[in-house]
Amino acid sequence: MTVDTNLERQPKQQKLRNAEYYDMQDVMDKLYEESCKGKSFHNLMHLITSENNILLAFRNIKNNKGSMTKGTDGKTITQYKGWSEEQFVKYFQSKFANYHPKSVRRTEIPKVGQPDKMRPLGIPCMDDRIIQQCIIQVLEPICEARFHAHSYGFRPNRSASHAIARAQSLMNVSKLHYVVDVDIKGFFDNVNHGKLLKQMWAMGIRDKSLICIIGKILKSEIEGIGRPDKGTPQGGIISPLLSNIVLNELDWWLSDQWETKSTRYPYTHSHKYEALKKSNLKEFFFVRYADDFKILCRDYKTAKKIFIAVKEWLWERLGLEISPEKSKITNVRKKKTDFLGFALYVTKKGKKYVSKSNISEKAKKTMKTKLKEQIKVIQHDTSPHQVSQLNAMILGMHNYYNTATGCSRDFREINFVVSKSLKHRLRVKTKKAKRNKNSKSPLPEKVLKSRTYQQFYGSYGGKPKVVAGVQIFPIYGCKFVTPRMFTREVNKYTPQGRQLIHKNLSTVHSLIQYLLETKEYGKSVEYNDNRISLMAGQNGKCAVTGETLCIFDMECHHKKPKKLGGTDEYRNLVWLKSDVHKLIHATEEDTIAKYLDILKLDDKALKKVNSLRLSAENLEIVVKAN
């Protein structure tokens, strides 16, 4: 069998399907369960180098948008095109047997929130990326069982909005208004390699061969610099997991001072805190996202003590310094504190304080810059694709920052600035066409009326701006959405947790974001717009099976094929799972039987398939009763 090199990006839950496809889910569940019980793991390499794990790594890597990024050897995922599965597996098993990573390509990207400053990024070669993916697939379930509940960065099913919700809950419910901001100076560049490997050992990862390989990864030569003696290579697949392992010790040290403090008497949750308040212990809670963390305290005195204690602990235990300029104590009743692009504070409401949030000034500046840069691109390449890229940026910004209570006002401010650039740079492109006086539509007759625009932004006033026949999403069109706390039961390594993931994780926005970013070239503007509208209309589900669609497994079908006179109209399109689409067009009996066996359709679904087959001028499928 030839290794598949179909290069598409996948949503989060597709990795669950990949794991099930290669029979690795049960293995991961077992590792998680045993790690929860405190077991140590001495023989992990046989799992890491297993055939199924290597093939799963390839499947996960090839669907990542970075799969076409070259390392120092100039190769991408396409180098494996045409390889058999056996050849591919044996190649990587031999690499593991005597592993020596290639050098890492160094590049620089703008810092988040500081576009004028750059941060280094190390890009491993493709072979090394697959090896790191093999390792992380086995290590992640072990580490997830040991990580603290209130660490949210680079972890499955957790996001920045969960961290924001946690911080605001501590301000609202627990009434903790003194925030300790600790900024670790150059965290990723200063991680102690020896300490990290000892932390992995303490976490139960005790396979010496694996520890040796990770040591080699940490000391991979950086192009033009040499071999590092400290730090984790930013840009590597395994780096986020390693950074969480380093700071997990800090998480539990902080937590054990109050939140998870053990007591002689087995109190219930609420009674335990009441008892602790009567002691001399200091009350505080923390929330962490990667190396960005907040410690929320009851009063300034406690905050000052915690600030000093954390500073000393980081230096003595991890050899890390804090940045004096960026580390501080903030009273959020008087001043805002920045966290993950949000500015958090509290305001008086009656007799109590209520948490509020805005987009931080740094984040607003970054968004203005990015939008203006894309407008410059459109000025030189006025194509529907580039305008859709702008729309994808706007939608992505709205989806991230809509949990800020002041997001509407903030985006109106951004819109005011960016609209000037839009007007001056694209004034010729947005010139109004003549409109039928009898028409009630705010759009010129020659402009395509976008269903996508109507579904997401139709309730907003104002005349839509149109460039290259595509309506630009209104930058000001963002409404507040209450951030939700993370549900601990959601877990990709338990059957019950996976059910919650499939039930609760809405994929519609991620699918639409993907469709906006990946136009089908050679297709009409009408088709590219209607397929996006249709995705929202079908709520991201297959029209036949009702199952949730994913990027790796979905196709847009013309009910009446274009060769038979069909159009790109909304009513002539339908989103289907790939296997359903193949069944509709199948004419050979063996092929039909194959997909019927895969799909196992009920009578209702088969009726829908036959309706679509007849529209495509194919014969109905008749299933004979046994």
Language-model features, listed with the residues they occupy:
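Conserved polymerase palm-domain catalytic core
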Residues: 88, 96, 103, 108, ...
